[in-house]
Curated annotation (Swiss-Prot):
It is found in: Cytoplasm. The keyword Cytoplasm applies. Required for maturation of 30S ribosomal subunits. Keywords: Cytoplasm, Ribosome biogenesis. Belongs to the RimP family. This is Ribosome maturation factor RimP. It comes from the Bacteria. One of its GO terms (biological process) is translation. InterPro entries: Ribosome_maturation_RimP, RimP_C, RimP_C_sf, RimP_N, RimP_N_sf. One of its GO terms (cellular component) is cytosol.
């Protein structure tokens, strides 16, 4: 997780938890005046639109006071969904055996994108099987990862 996103997570997690929800993760997409701060929230009973609105109000008040983002941005609050993003080691541990998409920063064997079952996690390294080959991907090298939905 990027340092800025970690700072936002630390700032906003208590506000989300105050509503009885869990902050699954944060994405900040910087695009000039079209930047987006996206919060993914979760709850054991699921998330509905009222939950998102409640968290948006709570978090919006903190962002207005603390003002951690100097440029204009849109705040989006949603559930992680069936293709949930994976941000933390615990998220990966929950989906061992499932198919995931991973995009890494520094290429490994000439590739940056991997899609396959998460076979194991060893010492902060994911082992993802792609075309019968096990790739070892350092969690610190991951740009983005998500669960592949089963239908």
């Amino acid at each position: 997780m990027a340092k800025f996103e970690q700072k936002l997570t630390d700032l906003l997690r208590p506000a989300v938890e105050e509503t009885g929800k869990t902050l699954h993760g944060i994405e900040y997409i910087s695009a000039g005046n079209n930047s987006v701060l996206r919060l993914f929230i979760d709850h054991e009973n699921g998330i509905n639109v009222d939950d998102c609105a409640e968290v948006s109000r709570q978090v919006g008040a903190i962002l207005d006071v603390e003002d951690p983002i100097s440029s204009e941005y849109s705040l989006e609050v949603s559930s992680p969904g069936v293709d949930r993003p994976l941000f933390e080691l615990a998220h990966f541990q929950e989906v061992i055996g499932e198919t995931i998409n991973v995009k890494i920063s520094m290429p490994l064997n000439g590739r940056r994108k991997f899609k396959g079952p998460l076979v194991a996690i060893e010492n902060d390294t994911l082992i993802v099987e792609v075309d019968s080959i096990d790739y070892e991907l350092a969690i610190s090298n991951i740009d983005k990862a998500n669960l592949v939905a089963k239908f």
